[in-house]
């Protein structure tokens, strides 16, 4: 059983590394970073407690929102649909008006720039 699981994982990694474009690998690395950050915050909440509850909520919800936005950008790039620059720009404008903290704007700008199709 473990040999088959190991072979599936090794085949997945080989195909992922050989066939996935660099742009999507970067988005996947960012998604992994956000996931680990959210898990770390949630683990800290379980172990230590939620004394400054508003701080925990803002950090955790920021991770969830960033994960959703980055996942959306990743799905846009993986699909066979053609997305125009106008649609990406409108997505960026919507993102700027929907996110109030200034530190969220560079993340959103990076995600919106990735949705332009091409090499």
Swiss-Prot record:
The chain crosses the membrane at residues 31-51, 55-75, 82-98. Residues 52-54, 99-119 are lumenal. The modification N-acetylserine is found at residue 2. It is a multi-pass membrane protein. GO terms for cellular component: oligosaccharyltransferase complex. Keywords: Acetylation, Endoplasmic reticulum, Membrane, Transmembrane, Transmembrane helix. Pathway: Protein modification; protein glycosylation. Pfam families: DAD (PF02109). Residues 2-30, 76-81 are cytoplasmic. It is found in: Endoplasmic reticulum membrane. GO terms for biological process: protein glycosylation; protein N-linked glycosylation. Component of the oligosaccharyltransferase (OST) complex. OST exists in two different complex forms which contain common core subunits RPN1, RPN2, OST48, OST4, DAD1 and TMEM258, either STT3A or STT3B as catalytic subunits, and form-specific accessory subunits. STT3A complex assembly occurs through the formation of 3 subcomplexes. Subcomplex 1 contains RPN1 and TMEM258, subcomplex 2 contains the STT3A-specific subunits STT3A, DC2/OSTC, and KCP2 as well as the core subunit OST4, and subcomplex 3 contains RPN2, DAD1, and OST48. Subunit of the oligosaccharyl transferase (OST) complex that catalyzes the initial transfer of a defined glycan (Glc(3)Man(9)GlcNAc(2) in eukaryotes) from the lipid carrier dolichol-pyrophosphate to an asparagine residue within an Asn-X-Ser/Thr consensus motif in nascent polypeptide chains, the first step in protein N-glycosylation. N-glycosylation occurs cotranslationally and the complex associates with the Sec61 complex at the channel-forming translocon complex that mediates protein translocation across the endoplasmic reticulum (ER). All subunits are required for a maximal enzyme activity. Belongs to the DAD/OST2 family. This is Dolichyl-diphosphooligosaccharide--protein glycosyltransferase subunit DAD1. The gene is DAD1.
């Amino acid at each position: 059983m473990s040999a088959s699981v190991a072979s599936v994982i090794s085949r997945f990694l080989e195909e992922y590394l050989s066939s996935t474009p660099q742009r999507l690998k970067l988005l996947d690395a960012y998604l992994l970073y956000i996931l680990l950050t959210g898990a770390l915050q949630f683990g800290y909440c379980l172990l230590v407690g939620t004394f400054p509850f508003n701080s925990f909520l803002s950090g955790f919800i920021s991770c969830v929102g960033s994960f959703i936005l980055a996942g959306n950008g990743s799905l846009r790039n993986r699909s066979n649909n053609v997305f125009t620059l106008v649609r990406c720009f409108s997505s960026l404008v919507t993102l700027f008006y929907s996110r109030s903290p200034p530190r969220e704007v560079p993340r959103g700008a990076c995600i919106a720039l990735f949705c332009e199709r091409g090499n």
